Amino acid sequence: MKQTIGLLFIFLLWGNFCRAEIRIMPLGDSITEGGYEKRPGFPTTEGSYRTSLVPRLLSLNSKLSFVGSREAGPTALAQKRHEGHSGWRVDELIAGRVYARSYERGIRSWLPTYNPDIILLMIGTNDILQNYFIDQAPLRFQKLIDEIQRLTPRATILIASAIPTNNDHLNAEIEKYNSEIHSFVLSQRSQGASIYWVDMYNEAKMSWRKGDFSDGVHPSALGYLKMADVWFNHVAPFVSASLLRASLRE
Protein backbone atom coordinates (compact mmCIF):
# COMPACT_ATOMS: atom_id res chain seq x y z
CA MET A 1 0.00 0.00 0.00
CA LYS A 2 2.76 2.43 0.98
CA GLN A 3 4.61 1.58 -2.23
CA THR A 4 1.47 2.29 -4.27
CA ILE A 5 0.98 5.67 -2.57
CA GLY A 6 4.65 6.48 -3.16
CA LEU A 7 4.40 5.64 -6.85
CA LEU A 8 1.22 7.68 -7.16
CA PHE A 9 2.93 10.69 -5.57
CA ILE A 10 5.86 10.38 -7.96
CA PHE A 11 3.47 10.07 -10.91
CA LEU A 12 1.54 13.20 -9.87
CA LEU A 13 4.73 15.14 -9.24
CA TRP A 14 6.11 14.17 -12.64
CA GLY A 15 2.83 15.17 -14.29
CA ASN A 16 3.00 18.61 -12.71
CA PHE A 17 6.67 18.86 -13.65
CA CYS A 18 5.87 18.20 -17.29
CA ARG A 19 3.06 20.78 -17.33
CA ALA A 20 4.86 23.52 -15.37
CA GLU A 21 5.47 26.81 -17.09
CA ILE A 22 8.26 29.05 -15.81
CA ARG A 23 7.50 32.75 -16.03
CA ILE A 24 10.42 35.15 -16.52
CA MET A 25 9.93 38.93 -16.22
CA PRO A 26 12.58 41.30 -17.62
CA LEU A 27 12.19 44.39 -15.41
CA GLY A 28 13.83 47.78 -15.80
CA ASP A 29 14.08 50.88 -17.95
CA SER A 30 14.75 51.62 -21.63
CA ILE A 31 17.85 49.40 -21.62
CA THR A 32 15.52 46.46 -20.92
CA GLU A 33 12.97 47.76 -23.43
CA GLY A 34 15.40 48.23 -26.35
CA GLY A 35 14.83 49.88 -29.72
CA TYR A 36 16.93 53.03 -29.30
CA GLU A 37 19.35 52.52 -32.18
CA LYS A 38 18.66 55.52 -34.44
CA ARG A 39 21.80 55.55 -36.60
CA PRO A 40 21.14 54.81 -40.29
CA GLY A 41 22.52 51.48 -41.46
CA PHE A 42 23.06 50.00 -38.01
CA PRO A 43 21.30 46.79 -36.85
CA THR A 44 18.10 47.32 -34.92
CA THR A 45 18.10 46.94 -31.15
CA GLU A 46 14.35 46.31 -30.93
CA GLY A 47 13.92 43.63 -28.28
CA SER A 48 17.13 44.58 -26.41
CA TYR A 49 19.12 41.69 -24.94
CA ARG A 50 15.93 39.62 -25.06
CA THR A 51 16.30 39.09 -28.82
CA SER A 52 19.30 36.85 -28.22
CA LEU A 53 18.48 35.60 -24.72
CA VAL A 54 14.95 34.29 -25.29
CA PRO A 55 15.72 31.69 -28.00
CA ARG A 56 18.79 30.48 -26.13
CA LEU A 57 16.82 29.88 -22.94
CA LEU A 58 13.95 28.29 -24.86
CA SER A 59 16.44 25.85 -26.37
CA LEU A 60 17.14 24.68 -22.81
CA ASN A 61 13.52 24.59 -21.70
CA SER A 62 10.56 25.06 -24.04
CA LYS A 63 8.23 25.66 -21.08
CA LEU A 64 9.62 29.13 -20.37
CA SER A 65 7.29 32.10 -20.80
CA PHE A 66 8.49 35.71 -20.79
CA VAL A 67 5.86 37.89 -19.16
CA GLY A 68 5.00 41.57 -18.74
CA SER A 69 2.50 44.23 -19.71
CA ARG A 70 4.57 45.44 -22.66
CA GLU A 71 5.49 43.77 -25.93
CA ALA A 72 8.42 44.67 -28.18
CA GLY A 73 10.91 42.92 -30.39
CA PRO A 74 11.66 41.88 -33.97
CA THR A 75 9.24 39.62 -35.83
CA ALA A 76 11.47 36.60 -35.33
CA LEU A 77 11.41 36.93 -31.54
CA ALA A 78 8.96 34.29 -30.33
CA GLN A 79 8.25 35.92 -26.97
CA LYS A 80 8.23 39.70 -26.76
CA ARG A 81 6.76 40.42 -23.32
CA HIS A 82 8.70 42.54 -20.81
CA GLU A 83 8.52 45.34 -18.25
CA GLY A 84 11.09 47.77 -19.64
CA HIS A 85 9.96 51.39 -19.14
CA SER A 86 11.86 54.23 -20.76
CA GLY A 87 13.09 56.93 -18.38
CA TRP A 88 11.89 55.23 -15.21
CA ARG A 89 13.80 55.47 -11.96
CA VAL A 90 13.97 53.00 -9.08
CA ASP A 91 11.18 54.66 -7.10
CA GLU A 92 8.87 54.73 -10.12
CA LEU A 93 8.98 50.96 -10.47
CA ILE A 94 7.36 50.86 -7.04
CA ALA A 95 4.91 53.76 -7.16
CA GLY A 96 4.27 54.05 -10.89
CA ARG A 97 4.69 57.15 -13.03
CA VAL A 98 2.49 60.17 -13.59
CA TYR A 99 2.40 61.55 -17.12
CA ALA A 100 0.73 64.74 -18.37
CA ARG A 101 -2.63 63.04 -18.92
CA SER A 102 -2.22 59.56 -17.53
CA TYR A 103 -0.79 57.39 -14.78
CA GLU A 104 1.02 54.09 -15.30
CA ARG A 105 1.15 51.68 -12.41
CA GLY A 106 4.30 49.86 -11.35
CA ILE A 107 5.20 46.51 -9.82
CA ARG A 108 2.19 46.56 -7.48
CA SER A 109 0.13 45.95 -10.60
CA TRP A 110 2.54 43.92 -12.74
CA LEU A 111 3.80 41.37 -10.23
CA PRO A 112 0.42 40.16 -8.94
CA THR A 113 -0.84 40.01 -12.53
CA TYR A 114 2.00 37.96 -14.01
CA ASN A 115 3.39 36.23 -10.89
CA PRO A 116 6.91 35.65 -12.29
CA ASP A 117 9.12 32.81 -11.09
CA ILE A 118 12.30 34.60 -12.18
CA ILE A 119 12.83 38.38 -12.37
CA LEU A 120 15.68 39.89 -14.41
CA LEU A 121 16.13 43.31 -12.81
CA MET A 122 18.32 46.14 -14.05
CA ILE A 123 17.45 49.63 -12.80
CA GLY A 124 19.19 52.77 -11.56
CA THR A 125 20.67 54.36 -14.65
CA ASN A 126 17.97 57.06 -14.82
CA ASP A 127 18.40 57.94 -11.16
CA ILE A 128 21.97 58.91 -12.05
CA LEU A 129 21.25 60.48 -15.45
CA GLN A 130 18.51 62.64 -13.88
CA ASN A 131 20.71 63.44 -10.85
CA TYR A 132 17.75 62.41 -8.72
CA PHE A 133 18.96 62.36 -5.11
CA ILE A 134 21.72 59.99 -6.14
CA ASP A 135 22.96 59.38 -2.60
CA GLN A 136 19.54 57.94 -1.73
CA ALA A 137 19.33 55.67 -4.79
CA PRO A 138 20.67 52.56 -2.99
CA LEU A 139 18.08 53.04 -0.23
CA ARG A 140 15.34 53.34 -2.86
CA PHE A 141 16.68 50.14 -4.41
CA GLN A 142 16.43 48.33 -1.09
CA LYS A 143 12.81 49.43 -0.78
CA LEU A 144 12.18 48.14 -4.31
CA ILE A 145 13.55 44.70 -3.43
CA ASP A 146 11.52 44.65 -0.21
CA GLU A 147 8.37 45.33 -2.23
CA ILE A 148 9.21 42.72 -4.88
CA GLN A 149 9.76 40.13 -2.15
CA ARG A 150 6.48 41.07 -0.50
CA LEU A 151 4.55 40.78 -3.75
CA THR A 152 6.28 37.65 -5.09
CA PRO A 153 7.88 35.88 -2.12
CA ARG A 154 8.70 32.75 -4.13
CA ALA A 155 10.38 34.52 -7.03
CA THR A 156 14.09 34.30 -7.76
CA ILE A 157 15.49 37.78 -8.40
CA LEU A 158 18.59 38.24 -10.55
CA ILE A 159 19.92 41.75 -10.03
CA ALA A 160 22.20 43.18 -12.71
CA SER A 161 24.54 46.07 -12.07
CA ALA A 162 23.98 49.20 -14.15
CA ILE A 163 26.12 49.32 -17.28
CA PRO A 164 28.62 52.11 -18.10
CA THR A 165 28.01 55.11 -20.33
CA ASN A 166 30.35 57.25 -22.47
CA ASN A 167 30.74 59.76 -19.60
CA ASP A 168 33.47 59.21 -17.01
CA HIS A 169 31.74 61.31 -14.33
CA LEU A 170 28.50 59.35 -14.72
CA ASN A 171 30.44 56.10 -14.69
CA ALA A 172 31.99 57.00 -11.34
CA GLU A 173 28.50 57.49 -9.92
CA ILE A 174 27.31 54.23 -11.52
CA GLU A 175 30.23 52.31 -10.03
CA LYS A 176 29.45 53.71 -6.57
CA TYR A 177 25.77 52.80 -6.95
CA ASN A 178 26.64 49.30 -8.16
CA SER A 179 28.97 48.75 -5.23
CA GLU A 180 26.29 49.69 -2.72
CA ILE A 181 23.55 47.54 -4.21
CA HIS A 182 26.04 44.65 -4.51
CA SER A 183 26.71 44.90 -0.78
CA PHE A 184 22.96 44.86 -0.18
CA VAL A 185 22.55 41.73 -2.31
CA LEU A 186 25.33 39.97 -0.41
CA SER A 187 23.63 40.88 2.86
CA GLN A 188 20.33 39.52 1.62
CA ARG A 189 21.98 36.33 0.40
CA SER A 190 23.53 35.77 3.84
CA GLN A 191 20.00 35.85 5.25
CA GLY A 192 18.78 33.22 2.79
CA ALA A 193 17.01 35.49 0.30
CA SER A 194 16.60 34.15 -3.24
CA ILE A 195 18.38 37.06 -4.90
CA TYR A 196 21.57 36.89 -6.95
CA TRP A 197 24.11 39.35 -8.28
CA VAL A 198 24.84 39.70 -12.01
CA ASP A 199 27.89 41.93 -12.51
CA MET A 200 26.83 43.22 -15.90
CA TYR A 201 29.12 46.27 -15.67
CA ASN A 202 32.30 44.15 -15.55
CA GLU A 203 31.28 40.82 -17.08
CA ALA A 204 29.88 42.25 -20.31
CA LYS A 205 32.99 44.39 -20.78
CA MET A 206 31.02 47.00 -22.72
CA SER A 207 32.70 50.15 -23.95
CA TRP A 208 31.77 53.13 -26.09
CA ARG A 209 35.11 52.78 -27.83
CA LYS A 210 34.30 49.20 -28.87
CA GLY A 211 31.00 50.14 -30.53
CA ASP A 212 28.86 48.68 -27.76
CA PHE A 213 26.62 51.76 -27.46
CA SER A 214 24.36 53.54 -29.91
CA ASP A 215 24.13 56.89 -28.13
CA GLY A 216 26.34 56.77 -25.06
CA VAL A 217 23.65 55.25 -22.80
CA HIS A 218 21.72 52.62 -24.77
CA PRO A 219 23.54 49.54 -26.08
CA SER A 220 24.04 48.86 -29.76
CA ALA A 221 23.17 45.46 -31.21
CA LEU A 222 26.71 44.35 -30.36
CA GLY A 223 26.34 45.60 -26.79
CA TYR A 224 23.06 43.75 -26.36
CA LEU A 225 24.68 40.52 -27.54
CA LYS A 226 27.25 40.90 -24.78
CA MET A 227 24.50 41.54 -22.25
CA ALA A 228 22.58 38.48 -23.45
CA ASP A 229 25.68 36.32 -22.95
CA VAL A 230 25.98 37.46 -19.33
CA TRP A 231 22.27 37.04 -18.61
CA PHE A 232 22.31 33.56 -20.14
CA ASN A 233 25.26 32.42 -18.02
CA HIS A 234 23.45 33.49 -14.86
CA VAL A 235 19.87 32.51 -15.74
CA ALA A 236 20.46 29.08 -17.31
CA PRO A 237 21.34 27.31 -14.03
CA PHE A 238 18.02 28.43 -12.52
CA VAL A 239 15.80 27.19 -15.32
CA SER A 240 15.55 23.52 -14.33
CA ALA A 241 15.47 24.29 -10.60
CA SER A 242 12.66 26.79 -11.10
CA LEU A 243 10.76 24.29 -13.21
CA LEU A 244 10.69 21.83 -10.32
CA ARG A 245 9.70 24.54 -7.83
CA ALA A 246 6.83 25.62 -10.07
CA SER A 247 5.56 22.04 -10.30
CA LEU A 248 5.45 21.82 -6.53
CA ARG A 249 3.58 25.13 -6.36
CA GLU A 250 0.68 23.97 -8.57
Labelled PLM ranges:
Residues T4-W14:
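Sec-dependent N-terminal signal peptides
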Residues C18-A20:
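Boundary at the C-terminal end of the N-terminal hydrophobic targeting segment
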Residues R23-M25:
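Conserved beta-strand elements of the Class I
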Residues L27-I31, V67-A72, L121-N126, A160-T165, ...:
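Active-site-proximal beta-strand/loop segments in catalytic clefts of secreted hydrolases
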Residues T32, Y36, V54, L58-S59, ...:
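Sec-exported extracytoplasmic/periplasmic mature domains
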Residues G34-L139, L170-S179:
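Conserved SGNH/GDSL esterase-like catalytic core that processes O-acyl groups on lipids
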Residues R81-S86, I163-R245:
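Catalytic His-Asp segment of secreted/periplasmic serine-dependent ester chemistry enzymes
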Residues M122-L129, I145-Y177, Y201-A204:
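Active-site segments of SGNH/GDSL-like serine hydrolases
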